[in-house]
UniProtKB/Swiss-Prot annotation:
Zn(2+) 2 binds at D66, H67, D215, H273. Zn(2+) 1 binds at H62, H64, H145, D215. Keywords: Endonuclease, Hydrolase, Metal-binding, Nuclease, tRNA processing, Zinc. This is Ribonuclease Z. Belongs to the RNase Z family. GO terms for molecular function: 3'-tRNA processing endoribonuclease activity; zinc ion binding. The gene is rnz. The active site is at D66 (proton acceptor).
Length: 319
């Protein structure tokens, strides 16, 4: 299955020597989508030997420095790699993302030899579906933070079941375009008879659903957007002893993150966006323990810089 999730960074506020700022990249059928782009994101790409030229889209959650200061570097990197980039780069984010980037491009006289397409989200006005093709769609949800902040949902479409050649031959369906249309899930007319895909296809395979959620305070409706998702990467900035600080700063504790995914019956939960105060493994495992106590059957894990998750049937395997 051609679906990988790469953890480029897991920290909040500022990068540490062993923990870059929160950023996640999806590799899906030969193209990549980057979620957030803090300082040193391009270093993570280099370390993990991920091609920045395959990045088709960059989705920014909000305009705080730890989520956007690496964006200009990525744009410059793509421009300085010769004329190898042919496709435009789509950048999605809240109002202001275009002004932020274009101002920096102008001031630094960056020569970019490819097109940037901006899609600025007006929360509660922009349609939820941001992008869609035959394999997937990307949606946004409103989060609760000190400025406009967006969560992203990556939803793989259901796939038609296995093509039954014997049934196709028994129905005299010729090889070629007609079979292809049926395999893609479309009805066809053949000799005056309508043939539906279910006649020659096996059971439909459910697509995978992934969510990237940071930065946000707890709110009841959040779990409704991620019901039965296969994997949710969600911020877990603080331990429970700092729950009042989390509330004040509009962030989540690991325990609250687990409450959200438990309520949503999420299959796997990855904790991310850890406070810079947690420099020891002991601190991070205390975060993990608090989340696991809240949702014992939640398949909860700590996201780690350099981690790769590979899709395998209805779940993701940590490589």
């Amino acid at each position: 299955m051609n679906f990988n999730i790469n953890i480029l960074g897991t920290g909040g506020t500022r990068p540490l020597h062993n923990r870059y700022l929160t950023s996640v990249l999806i590799e899906y059928h030969g193209e990549s989508i980057l979620f957030d782009c803090g300082e040193a994101t391009q270093m993570s790409l280099r370390k993990q030997k991920i091609s920045w030229q395959k990045i088709k889209m960059i989705c920014i959650t909000h305009l705080h420095a730890d989520h956007i200061t690496g964006l200009l570097g990525i744009v410059m990197l793509m421009a300085q790699s010769g004329d190898t980039r042919k496709e435009p780069l789509t950048i999605i984010g809240p109002i202001g993302i275009k002004k932020y980037l274009e101002t920096n491009i102008e001031l630094l006289r960056v020569h970019k030899n490819y097109q940037i397409i901006y899609k600025e989200i007006i929360i509660n006005k922009t349609e939820p579906v941001l992008y869609e093709d035959k394999r997937k769609r990307i949606e946004y949800i409103k989060l609760k933070h000190s400025i406009d902040c967006i969560g992203y949902l990556f939803i793989e479409k259901d796939k038609p079941g296995k093509f039954d050649i014997q049934k196709a031959e028994s129905l005299n369906i010729p090889k070629g375009p007609i079979r292809k249309k049926l395999q893609e899930g479309y009805e066809v007319m053949l000799n005056g008879r309508k043939i539906v895909p279910s006649e020659i296809l096996g059971e439909t395979k459910k697509g995978l659903k992934f969510a990237y959620i940071t930065d946000t305070a707890y709110f009841e409706e959040l779990s409704t957007y991620i019901q039965n998702f296969n994997l949710v990467i969600i911020e877990s900035t603080f331990k429970d002893d700092l729950k009042e600080e989390a509330k004040k700063k509009l962030h989540l504790t690991a325990k609250l993150a687990a409450q959200i995914t438990k309520k949503a019956k999420v299959y796997q939960t990855g904790l991310i966006h850890f406070s810079e105060r947690y420099t020891l493994n002991k601190d991070l495992y205390e975060l993990l323990n608090e989340a696991q106590q809240e949702y014992p059957n939640g398949n909860i894990f700590l996201a780690k810089d350099g981690m790769k998750l590979k899709a395998n049937k209805d779940k993701f395997i940590i490589k």
